Each structure stands twice: as C-alpha cells, then as structure tokens.
C-alpha cells in the first residue's frame, strides 16, 4: 500500500474513474446488444424503433468518448460497425 499522500489520492482517484468508466462501457454494451436484436427483427413497421435505438447507442458512445471512457477511434469503430450492420440488414430486407 502506498504511504505517500499523493499516491494514496491517485489510488482513490483511479479506482473512482475505473468504476465510472466501467459503467459507461456496460451501458454501451447493453444498448448495442438491444440495438442488434432490433436490427435482427427488422421489419418495415419497426424501422423507426431501430433508428431510435441506433441514435441512443450513438449518443451513449459519444458521451463515453467525451468523458474519456473510450478512445475516439474506439467510439468511431463501434458506431461504424453498427451502421454497417444496419445498412446490410436494410439491404437484405429490400
């Protein structure tokens, strides 16, 4: 265990940040899974629901990037993959 006061503070701070980052990552994973389930069950009637869920995932990813839980490239990659899956599902439906 650290004896230096600044080191003790850094341990507390890093633990707090770890928990916050974990929360952001968990929310993004959960919303992404929900969105992928909506995309799998894509029909003309629930196209708006799918687009709404995608926008919610995008919003949470952007917030996670802003707070530092995700690197900007990681967020961009997650959004691009989601968009590619959605576009492919739309193409298969038509």
Curated annotation (Swiss-Prot):
GO terms for biological process: translation. Keywords: Chloroplast, Plastid, Ribonucleoprotein, Ribosomal protein, RNA-binding, rRNA-binding. GO terms for molecular function: small ribosomal subunit rRNA binding; structural constituent of ribosome. Disulfide bonds: none annotated. InterPro entries: Ribosomal_bS20, Ribosomal_bS20_sf. It is found in: Plastid, Chloroplast. Pfam families: Ribosomal_S20p. Its main location: plastid. It comes from the Eukaryota. GO terms for cellular component: chloroplast; small ribosomal subunit. SUPFAM superfamilies: Ribosomal protein S20. The keyword Disulfide bond does not apply. Binds directly to 16S ribosomal RNA. NCBIfam families: S20. Belongs to the bacterial ribosomal protein bS20 family. PANTHER family: 30S RIBOSOMAL PROTEIN S20, SMALL RIBOSOMAL SUBUNIT PROTEIN BS20C. This is Small ribosomal subunit protein bS20c. It comes from Porphyra purpurea. The lineage of its organism: Eukaryota, Rhodophyta, Bangiophyceae, Bangiales, Bangiaceae.
